[in-house]
Amino acid sequence: MARRPGSSSRGPARSDRLPAEAVTSARKPHAAAPTPPASPDPGLVLLGEFGRPHGLHGEVRLKSHTSEPLAIAGYGPLHASDGRTLELANVRPAAGSSPDLLIVRVKGVDDRTGAEALNRVTLAIARERLGKVEDEDEFFLTDLIGLTVEDGAGTVIGTIVAVPNFGGGDLLEIRPAAGGPTALLPFTKAFVPSLDIAGGKVVADPPDDLFAPPGPKPADDPG
């Protein structure tokens, strides 16, 4: 779950189905821990991503996006990005690693070959299985995908197509209304002063060169 930039913390939303509060909330600016990326499918919420195999007997590394990393095992069957439905078993922390990195076994995967096939596969849960968000300042990052981006004058400048996070905070990937390559805008109060999910838009204050093409390389640049 995410929180509007600059809003105060009010505690987790309650759930009448699966525990929505287990999904990591968006962090305030400058927080150390990254947040989960939004799913490209608005009907799904990402919960984790597999990494490299661990050993020879089917175990595999998994980066959990839930606020309590081990809680990912309690969601039952999950949607995998390769089209399968997978269920986790024997989940434990990865020794000597960050708290969100786990060693897991997937039901039906019993050897290293099967574990290798999971590398970079993501796990998601159907949004409808999560509880309702009752706090007006909370939402899923998936809710942002498809919203129109306007500037302060009400001019449409683009559409949000993804919400990546590379470790430094959530970013809005915006496809410009005029066409051309997408650009990334930090999802902070300074750059996104207003958010109206119900109205289908955000108001942004981007730098003037947000969609500018890369400039020419300096003459002495060896690249």
Swiss-Prot record:
One of its GO terms (molecular function) is ribosome binding. Residues 1-44, 204-223 are annotated as: Disordered. It is found in: Cytoplasm. Residues 1-12 have a biased composition (Low complexity). It comes from the Bacteria. Keywords: Chaperone, Cytoplasm, Ribosome biogenesis, rRNA processing. One of its GO terms (biological process) is rRNA processing. Pfam families: PRC_RimM, RimM. The PRC barrel domain binds ribosomal protein uS19. Belongs to the RimM family. Binds ribosomal protein uS19. PANTHER family: RIBOSOME MATURATION FACTOR RIMM. This is Ribosome maturation factor RimM. It comes from Methylorubrum extorquens (strain PA1).
